[in-house]
Amino acid sequence: MPTTFTPNSPASSCSIHHRASPSRGARNSVRFTRPRAAAAATNSVLSAPSSVPPAYVPPPPPPPTKMFPEAGDAAAAKAAARRCGKKKDGLNFFQRAAAVALDAFEEGFITNVLERPHALPRTADPAVQIAGNFAPVGEQPPVRSLPVSGRIPPFINGVYARNGANPHFEPTAGHHLFDGDGMVHAVRIRNGAAESYACRFTETARLGQERALGRAVFPKAIGELHGHSGIARLALFYARGLCGLVDPSHGTGVANAGLVYFNGRLLAMSEDDLPYQVRVTADGDLETVGRYDFDGQLGCAMIAHPKLDPVSGELFALSYDVIKKPYLKYFYFDADGTKSPDVEIELEQPTMIHDFAITENFVVVPDHQVVFKLGEMFRGGSPVVLDREKTSRFGVLPKHATSSLEMVWVDVPDCFCFHLWNAWEEAESGEVVVVGSCMTPADSIFNESDEHLESVLTEIRLNTRTGESTRRAVLPPAAQVNLEVGMVNRAMLGRKTRYAYLAVAEPWPKVSGFAKVDLATGELTKFEYGEGRFGGEPCFVPMGGAGAAASPARGEDDGYILSFVRDEAAGTSELLVVNAADMRLEATVQLPSRVPYGFHGTFINAGELATQA
């Protein structure tokens, strides 16, 4: 029988109980039954109490958040117009006539003939994709002195930043969650206090032009670009570009997925563009510095999950192209930001490669079954296709390779990993071990399916000597749960790790908690947010702050987990601080406004903040 648990007690497993609270309605409470030493169950569950003591009086609720934020003040709109877009009063006669004609073509033919008569699939229906707490919010300037219950460990000094999709304009056609404009949410913590919270759009060239025009004009890569209407929208966009109504030369990306701090810069990324540099100001605000090309060295898009080697300080990255060869390129930056030459990796067809992995000496590149076939649009379908005839494989390439001829490919049939959590080398067997979440159906995020989605935490072993592979589910069948978005202790990235901290993606696509998984034994410890409470990616902050290395005296799990949580019934948002070793709640930070569910985050320590470029 599972044990129950009281926060800040030595128990190691618990079950959730509820009791009425006069101040907040239903809240979670738990009771201690046995000490940690007696716990031997393979799986345990910890609950997240509302974490607000009875004496706590929450701050007044903020004004209702508008479903879609307005363009901002007049000065910001004028600045955006000068940077990126042209308002109609700045167009010549030909451009004004072209704008009217193209707008009429969009409304009369694309919208009324190609799109309106056809129901949208759930994967492109904005009523589904951005409903509830997936809906966007407006920007929030820094709000200071956030209420805290519990105790924030004093070594956590810095900023927790998390990226996400937040459409600035209400969709008028198809929209996928991944299509939204990038917005970064940031909580500044110092000396046990939560000093501030802020959220800001990443000011991409795309967003600047759309603000200047007063509406969305750039195609949405997933929600709109399918079938004949997708072809028409692409043609419309190119026509507007030829007429000088929009300028795609400054990038078309949304910078809504990943965040990495490298060489003095916080970079916001999506795989359709160069990264954008975002600076954290002294008062906890966020400002976009601009599109970052590494001082003129980077001329192509970069995926949203580059890998920072914790030992060498190098940043490793991929870039894929859906139109022309080479479909995939690999490169890296040394610790000072100097870029290597590209290594062109030969692929037979353009392939979605959202993530990859590094070991101490190699990069591990997935070449899986989700591919791009633009010709499917002419047949009325989506260009993102599950190619069942293709054999999935992983490529193992030396980190400092100069040619793809050094790549060793190993087949791993029927495997699709949207994310890879870590990889390492095992000298005795000559194998490269990869840990990722294998998703079925592989294209379920992009194409509607009646098949139940599963995301199985999997260990994949690649024998580069024999070209053979093996795989096993890390969790036993009885404990299987969908695990997505998360991380290992990044101080050990590319080296053998025992633990991974991953979001419990149930009920999909919401996240009801996170899990600490022992990758060797399959032991699972869940931290559940509680009934009606959902969050996102758990962010591991090692003891000593981001960048602190694990050591024999400091265990791999010696640190804390940060995670945003939304209480949908109470209408409140919080930042939880959870002990990563025993999975006990340490502190809860009450946030002043709604934080939508988002994607990936990172922690920037105080030393890094002080040396921002």
Swiss-Prot record:
Pro residues biased stretches: 51-62
EC class of the enzyme, as a word: oxidoreductase
Any GO CC annotation of this UniProt entry: chloroplast stroma
Induction notes from the record: Induced by abscisic acid (ABA) and salt. Induced by D-allose. Induced by drought stress.
Catalysed reaction equations from the record: a 9-cis-epoxycarotenoid + O2 = a 12'-apo-carotenal + 2-cis,4-trans-xanthoxin; 9-cis-violaxanthin + O2 = (3S,5R,6S)-5,6-epoxy-3-hydroxy-5,6-dihydro-12'-apo-beta-caroten-12'-al + 2-cis,4-trans-xanthoxin; 9'-cis-neoxanthin + O2 = (3S,5R,6R)-3,5-dihydroxy-6,7-didehydro-5,6-dihydro-12'-apo-beta-caroten-12'-al + 2-cis,4-trans-xanthoxin
One Gene Ontology term from the biological process aspect of the record: carotene catabolic process
Positions of Fe cation binding: H305, H354, H419, H600
Bias (Low complexity): 37-50
Keyword Transmembrane helix found: no
Organism taxonomic ancestry: Eukaryota, Viridiplantae, Streptophyta, Embryophyta, Tracheophyta
GO MF: 9-cis-epoxycarotenoid dioxygenase activity; carotenoid dioxygenase activity; metal ion binding
Pfam families: RPE65
PANTHER family membership: 9-CIS-EPOXYCAROTENOID DIOXYGENASE NCED3, CHLOROPLASTIC (PTHR10543:SF26), BETA-CAROTENE DIOXYGENASE (PTHR10543)
Keyword Lipid biosynthesis: no
EC number: 1.13.11.51
Species this chain originates from: Oryza sativa subsp. japonica (Rice)
Named cofactor requirement(s): Fe(2+)
Location of this chain's protein in the cell: Plastid, Chloroplast
Major location (coarse): plastid
Family: Belongs to the carotenoid oxygenase family.
Keywords from the named record: Abscisic acid biosynthesis, Chloroplast, Dioxygenase, Iron, Metal-binding, Oxidoreductase, Plastid, Stress response, Transit peptide
Protein name: 9-cis-epoxycarotenoid dioxygenase NCED5, chloroplastic
Residue segments, region Disordered: 1-62
Cofactor descriptive note: Binds 1 Fe(2+) ion per subunit.
